[in-house]
Amino acid sequence: RMAASRLPGKPLADIHGRPMIAHVLDRAREAGIGPLAVACAEEEIAAAARAAGAQTVLVADDVPSGTDRVQRAMKALDPAGEFDVVVNLQGDFPTIRPETLRAVLAPLEDPSVDIGTLVCPIANEAEAHTDSFVKCACAFTGDAMVAPALYFSRLPIPWGEGPRWHH
């Protein structure tokens, strides 16, 4: 979103001469997981995404979350409902590794799993206590790389031993 509170204009932030959204699209293409589209509310972001070779769909900014934006975009992009898996990659994650994007799809091969999301350990204590970061209570066991997400919160999540997770 262009109106991001911590970094206004973030999707167009210049990273080595290209907008952030172009780098995110590069990572998604490198993952090779399927067709790409950028859902956004602002024409400036759409123009940058098109310049980077992406299909775009403008979605009104009255949605409460990125997930809601994706749902609206899919109604326009896939009205027949042909796609049964959608990866919601936020446009402010230019450092995501392509193998991470591929890995998020693995749990969806289990027919009892409807949704997957990535989490990472909270590295900065301040992130655990700010409402600008979504935290996830996960039920990881042992060295498992996949776990049920129990709930998400912008408030601090109480925890015992082990890492706390950022969504």
What are the residue ranges of the model-derived segments?
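Short phosphate-binding loop-to-helix
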Residues: E44-L89, F93-A103
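Conserved core of the sugar-phosphate nucleotidyltransferase
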Residues: I96-H167
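Short, high-confidence coil segments that cap the C-terminus of an alpha-helix
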Residues: I33, G81-F83, D110-D114
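N-terminal glycine-rich phosphate-binding loop and ensuing alpha1 helix
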Residues: R1-C40
